[in-house]
């Protein structure tokens, strides 16, 4: 294959400690507000089409500038300044959300925050890839994701409880969580100063940071990366189609409280935390492709549950399922992306992947919002949403099959079937019997 894997260098535990700290504190910051932004928009009066714009902007804006940021990072061979700057900007721009009074204002602030803060995303992925041994990417990624999930889970639960207890306007309910998001966001950025990064500029990422021709050439020279990107495009459109509808179902159909909204995220996070260490080890033993396919197939159940839900408890069940597939799937997806990108181009190619999928998510979410608006106008709120969810579920099934075309860039010591067989054999399915008695 044309792409080289990251050099096999051992990860220094002391070097990784700031990454764990950043993951926990940063996810605590986003966890206090992020899970409630869709509900915030709905309570501000957003329609289905406006929720389509909300989700579309939330997906495209973070990815618009990632390619030039990633390319610039590759050119100068530095990651920390971008992670630090992106985190500080993101934290500061939580402040305007304290004063928004309409869904349009909320969308505008989120867009600006996402564009300016996006410099941290491709550089964070590149830094992780550089600091970890290639044979331990799955396990190390799972541990970092687990640390992040713990921070987010605790923050979401605390924020949901506070919002239920605080009486007053919508802005007053969000005031304390937003202040916490600002403080933790600043802290998570400053902790990256502790990482000792040695500059390693290279000439592989040449040309203008806004250049397209050289990026296209690098992508075309990476067939495994291209195949992965194409599969993500197909699945991503149908996956994002249902995103604008989740908050509408939660608030307008099921009348969930802020604490119940928090529990939806917390349950999923708790399940993911419990299973992610095993998921990381499994990814490194059996490879990425099988788990990615299973992950994508499992996501069919999410819009299905939302379509049929008549109680918030049904969404809790969906959160359990989502937590299981995320524990294995997200680790496998991220590890595979690192596997099929060259180290010296990882920032650029990661940003390209995020940009392409972000555009797809933008189109899918916008289409889903307007489609739901049209269907709800004809068939009513519940049945109109159910039809949109059905299209998303069917499309997810078709898109999941495109990941079967992925090629593993290396061999692995086991298979999913072998691992499952070993687990079954260890289970006490039948009591042992002694010798037959006469």
Feature-to-residue mapping (PLM):
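A membrane-interface helix-boundary motif in multi-pass transporters
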Residues: 163-182, 372-395
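Structural signature of the two symmetry-related core transmembrane helices
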Residues: 81-95, 182, 290-305, 393
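Juxtamembrane intracellular "pre-TM" segments in multi-pass secondary transporters
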Residues: 2-16, 197-230, 414-438
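Central cavity-lining transmembrane alpha-helices of secondary-active solute carriers
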Residues: 53-71, 266-278
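Cytoplasmic helix-loop-helix junction between adjacent transmembrane helices
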Residues: 111-148
